[in-house]
Swiss-Prot record:
Residues annotated to bind ATP: K267
Motif 'KMSKS' region, residue numbers: 264-268
Major subcellular location class: cytoplasm
Catalytic activity: tRNA(Cys) + L-cysteine + ATP = L-cysteinyl-tRNA(Cys) + AMP + diphosphate
The encoding gene: cysS
Residues reported to bind Zn(2+): C27, C207, H232, E236
Native organism: Carboxydothermus hydrogenoformans (strain ATCC BAA-161 / DSM 6008 / Z-2901)
Family the UniProt entry places it in: Belongs to the class-I aminoacyl-tRNA synthetase family.
Stated name of the protein: Cysteine--tRNA ligase
Known EC number: 6.1.1.16
Length: 465
């Protein structure tokens, strides 16, 4: 398996720290608002990475944190008239609602910053003792000059960074690039007691302290969005390696941005979309399919047209799965030619995933499987053994992509299946009673809502369009 490592700027063979285990840390959301579609990309992608490792037989220790205290949370809490701790907890609950609908599994651990203050304080103390950090008037800063490898992750030169620094001038700092490990409490803000007086952690130290606690030194994979490479992940590397004297994470993976009309998504441009707003129009599995349809390091342009294309592509798979369920196969074992074809599709799938998790190419193998499967069903030669092989192959894609195929849709969290089936039953009774106008009215109204009824030898089927 090869992974593109941001640290070395090359694809490298993945060799885990411990055979049979993968230790992963992915930066989670700052809990001051609902997640947007840009947040959803790393959440879904790294969930898929975790799923693939598990499919290959690895035990995955997966940590995704919550930053539940920072300036944005404090400001939002003031607006909402609740405490920052309450606000953080509120949006953690809302995060899980959205993540569940995107098919995201719970991490092994979801640590919160507010529950790891002692570990953070110990790490800050250690950095001061080792000469990498200094305290000024209740604030503690990391001295970037003290760490000779500063810039190695992002590829930035420290002297050039100093020359072009647009950092807010702070006379307390020795160097404008020095970053806060501990912030002195301001009036009215939450605070914790520390050796430097009341205060709270800086942003970067949180992830270092929590990843070292749960994954240990020199863990396997650290992931996040490309926007975190500098300064967040660069600062994590500096403070962690200064603290332990050992390499931090071994493989750094970063997903590309989501754009809207080729522009970066931002609130100021008004092209900012919350996941739950999108889920009002599209099922979670369609959104997940869309997010995995492009290689994770490439930019991904977002609009309704592309989501509709993802929906149509997913329906092709759904229709095949439905046809496979309904076909009455011939008795007999799987045919050799079918075994060989399906083995080839799964080989292509594995090769794509092992080449830096190329989900787009892996999906192409799924559609090859679907095309071939449809021809076999149409031929009338499908055996019971053939059918079982197709079902087993589909289970692999479901397991890794985290998408159930052939299921009836949910919109805005509501399962419409019982309502549609009730209307189908009412329509059937109306037709028996020769009330064809009313039966046609139900069919036509459902069509207006995007639901098509199809008469088949086994009864009426329905699907979305």
């Amino acid at each position: 398996m090869k992974i593109y490592n941001t640290l070395t700027k090359t694809k490298e063979e993945f060799i885990p720290r411990e055979p049979g285990k993968v230790y992963m840390y992915v930066c989670g959301p700052t809990t001051y608002n609902y997640i947007h579609i840009g947040n959803a990309r790393p959440i879904v992608f790294f969930d898929t990475v975790r799923r693939y490792f598990e499919y290959k037989g690895f035990e995955v220790i997966y940590v995704q944190n919550f930053t539940d205290i920072d300036d944005k949370i404090i400001n939002r809490a003031l607006e909402e008239g609740i405490s920052p701790i309450e606000l953080g907890q509120k949006y953690i609950i809302e995060y899980f609602k959205d993540a569940d609908r995107l098919g995201v599994k719970r991490a092994t651990v979801h640590p919160k910053v507010t529950e790891h203050i002692p570990e953070i304080i110990e790490m800050v103390k250690g950095l001061i003792e080792k000469g990498y950090a200094y305290e000024v008037e209740g604030n503690v800063y990391f001295a970037v000059d003290s760490f000779s490898d500063y810039g190695k992750l992002s590829g930035r030169d420290l002297e050039e960074l100093k020359a072009g620094a647009r950092v807010e001038v702070d006379e307390k700092k020795k160097n404008p690039l020095d970053f806060a490990l501990w912030k002195k409490a301001k009036p009215g803000e939450p605070y914790w007691e520390s050796p430097w007086g009341p205060g709270r952690p800086g942003w970067h130290i949180e992830c270092s302290a929590m990843s070292l606690k749960y994954l240990g030194e020199n863990f396997d994979i650290h992931g996040g969005g490309a926007d975190l490479v500098f300064p967040h992940h660069e600062n994590e590397v500096a403070q962690s390696e200064a603290f332990t004297g050992k390499p931090f994470a071994r493989y750094w993976m970063h997903n590309g941005f989501i754009t809207v009309n080729q522009e970066k998504m931002s609130k100021s441009l008004g092209n900012f979309f919350l996941v739950r707003e999108i889920l009002e129009k599209f099922p979670g599995r369609v959104v997940r399919f869309f997010l995995l349809s492009t290689h994770y390091r490439s930019p991904l342009d977002f609009d309704d047209k592309k989501l509709n294309e993802a929906k149509a592509a997913l329906e092709r798979v759904d229709n095949f799965v439905q046809n496979l369920k309904e076909v009455n196969p011939l008795p007999g074992e799987a045919r050799i030619e079918i075994q060989e074809k399906i083995t080839n599709f799964l080989r292509d799938f594995n090769e794509a995933m092992e080449d830096d998790f190329n989900t787009a190419q892996a999906m192409a193998s799924l559609f090859e499987l679907v095309r071939f499967g449809n021809t076999q069903i149409a031929s009338g030669n499908l055996t019971a053994g053939d059918k079982k092989l197709f079902e087993e192959a589909l289970n692999v894609y479901t397991q890794v992509f985290g998408i159930e195929f052939g299921v009836l849709e949910k919109i805005a969290g509501e399962d419409i299946t019982p309502f549609v089936e009730l209307l189908i039953e009412v329509r059937a009774r109306l037709k028996k009673e020769k009330k064809y106008d009313l039966a046609d009215f139900i069919r036509d109204e459902l069509k207006k809502q995007g639901i098509i009824l199809e008469d088949t030898p086994k009864g009426v089927r329905w699907k979305r369009v």
